[in-house]
Amino acid sequence: MSLLERLNRKNKKYIAMQQAGQHSKNTHGATGFATSADEVREESYQAIKKEIHTHIIDEMPEDLQRVISQSSADQKELRRLVEGMCADAIKDNPFAIPLGDRERLVEELISEILGLGPIEPLLKDPSVTEVMVNGPDSIYIERKGRLQKTDVRFRNTEHLMHIIDRIVTAVGRRVDESSPMVDARLADGSRVNVIIPPLSLSGPCVTIRKFSKDVLTVDKMIEFGSFDQRMAEFLEDCVKGRLNIVVSGGTGSGKTTLLNVLSSYVPATERIVTLEDSAELQLKQDHVVTLETRPPNIEGEGEVTMRDLVRNALRMRPDRIIVGECRTGEALDMLQAMNTGHDGSMTTAHANSARDALSRLETMVLMSGMELPLRAIRSQIASAVDIIVQIARLRDGSRKIINIAEVTGMEGDIITLQDLFYFENHGVDQDGRITGAFLTSGLRPLCTEKLAMNGVTLPPDLFIM
């Protein structure tokens, strides 16, 4: 059966239900059975789209299919070619597709063939920062720090799995029952996590954290209310004065964004080595070496861990080592690097407070497999880490530095901290936004001497209350 015959067969139902919908409006009023007709109309439209999509793929030359699967391909040229094939298929079957649906059909076909199907427009929307797919019928986005449910849907689970396969195949991975979890990265740098049944009971789930091409600057973050000018000046002095900094916060709190801002203060004359699971940092300095971990292949071989990268980075004559996130035993190697001449290093950690960050570092060092006494671990942390910056995502979706604390040493077996700056919450205004003020504790940091040794003098009025 030709494409035209298949489309016309499907279109009979489409036209009949349109007429039925119009009749129901005339007979039963504005509501009638129009909703039912609209649903069948949409179902028929999706069936027609699927037929044309299958026809285009079948007719597409094999060499063009191979080019499409390559992330490095010229997307503008591919779009032009696929757009032409879509237009030809519609032109050859003009009675199957109503005129009003043709432009939408071409765009959706291009998204199906070149992009990620129905979620492609969400990925192109600059106001969307995260896309969360909880099965084929439930898709959420994060916009301006708030979660919103969309009316976007996949046709069915098979359609969603087809898009998932496209994502993981592009990075040489697979996802199936034997390997139901995958981390990947899109061509634009966005991070993707996939988990499928039997682990996910609600169906295949995809979480995409979009890669921002517009790097936030200090001025922008001050404008957004993430911190104030005094805190920015202090953090700039800390970076230029080669203090070791840990940025702490929960998931989605803006740790990597803040680390990127802090990294911008590193002098251009220094050699920086960045280590990440998924490359997100966008440093503007010239002398930057970016290293990325590698998961094991299908046979379970070839894995390169963060610990491997930290150890290798120490042999690369770095002036600064910046670890995107410490999660496990690499914390021990990072602390040793901080304690052995690599001052000015920075990393992030998942924790809800500065005190919790210290506990997390202890736990991560224990995960290295080294049987060290707890006091020795705490002593290592106290001598390596100078500043902990705590950032949080608040109820209104805003991200703020809620605390900057200095590690001052040890008293007995306890690592001591002192707060330097903090955010005082004043409540919620009539628009639902959290209000407050950034304040100083009035205490002058003990790291003043270390800063002075590196040519940085803190302004005397920086800590006046």
Spell out what each predicted region is.
Residues 397-465:
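NTP-binding/hydrolysis catalytic cores, primarily Walker-type P-loop NTPases
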Residues 212-223, 260, 264-311, 357-361:
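P-loop NTPase switch/communication element
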Residues 125, 133, 138-241:
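P-loop NTP-binding catalytic core
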Residues 65-66, 91-98, 114-125, 167-184, ...:
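Active-site phosphate-binding and catalytic loops of NTP-dependent enzymes
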Residues 247:
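Hydrophobic anchor at the beta1->P-loop junction of P-loop NTPases
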Residues 276, 281-289, 313-410:
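Conserved P-loop NTPase nucleotide-binding/switch module
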Residues 255:
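Conserved lysine of the Walker
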Residues 1-148:
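N-terminal anchoring/assembly modules that precede and organize ATP-driven motor systems
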